[in-house]
Amino acid sequence: MNESLLTQFGNSLTRVEKALENLKNGKGVLLVDDENRENEGDLIFPAETITVPQMVMLIRECSGIVCLCLTDKKVKKLGLTQMVHNNTCTYETAFTISIEAKEGVTTGVSAADRVTTILTAVKDDCKPEDLCHPGHVFPLRARAGGVLTRPGHTEGTVDLMRLAGYNPAGILCELTNPDGTMARLPQIINFAKKHNLAVLSIEDIIKYKKITT
């Protein structure tokens, strides 16, 4: 991680605190990982406050693969099986089967329909029969222990939601450049400044958790 580029947003502690303030106000944040890992930045929003305009931003400015990060407990409660039995992807990203709300959507692919699906899934009383499969929202199962166990965007998202006082469920999508390539740290920072978003790294969350928990 090129730490020097992030110092304009403060030190690790300050960056996490700014991100938590944004999230508490229902705004998004940009979470980056190490350049020796995926070297990507994910745009993240709290699941329980996601809006249609925010979903439009995720679809237009990011990869379009909108993911719902959930705890293992929530995944089991919703009856979501893993997408594959043998996960052979490089970072073992834990995709479950995709979901759609059973009611309140049309084809499920519009921004409004995806918001409906997410808000349905994160309700405390949501049951497996309230969802259908496959769908246009892709749940991810976070590992217990968060970023201290796996330094991934999924765990970082769930950790941030907990720290911000939300239920541990968040939305993420990978930021892309206008030409379709993946945004790297310089482009991520420019996007953050343009849209007044906080930027932090997974390493920042690791340091914050070690200090505060």
From Swiss-Prot:
Gene3D superfamilies (alphabetical): DHBP synthase
Protein name: 3,4-dihydroxy-2-butanone 4-phosphate synthase
A GO cellular component annotation in the UniProt record: cytosol
Species annotation: Clostridium botulinum (strain Hall / ATCC 3502 / NCTC 13319 / Type A)
Family that this chain belongs to: Belongs to the DHBP synthase family.
Pfam families assigned: DHBP_synthase
The keyword Iron is assigned to this record: no
Site residues, Essential for catalytic activity: 136, 174
Top-rank taxon, per record: Bacteria
One annotated GO biological process: riboflavin biosynthetic process
Cofactor(s) the protein requires to work: Mg(2+); Mn(2+)
Binding site for Mg(2+) 1: 38
Chain positions recorded as Mg(2+) 2 binding sites: 38, 153
Pathway assigned to this chain's UniProt record: Cofactor biosynthesis; riboflavin biosynthesis; 2-hydroxy-3-oxobutyl phosphate from D-ribulose 5-phosphate: step 1/1
CC cofactor note: Binds 2 divalent metal cations per subunit. Magnesium or manganese.
GO molecular function: 3,4-dihydroxy-2-butanone-4-phosphate synthase activity; magnesium ion binding; manganese ion binding
PANTHER family, A to Z: 3,4-DIHYDROXY-2-BUTANONE 4-PHOSPHATE SYNTHASE, GTP CYCLOHYDROLASE II-RELATED
General function of this protein: Catalyzes the conversion of D-ribulose 5-phosphate to formate and 3,4-dihydroxy-2-butanone 4-phosphate.
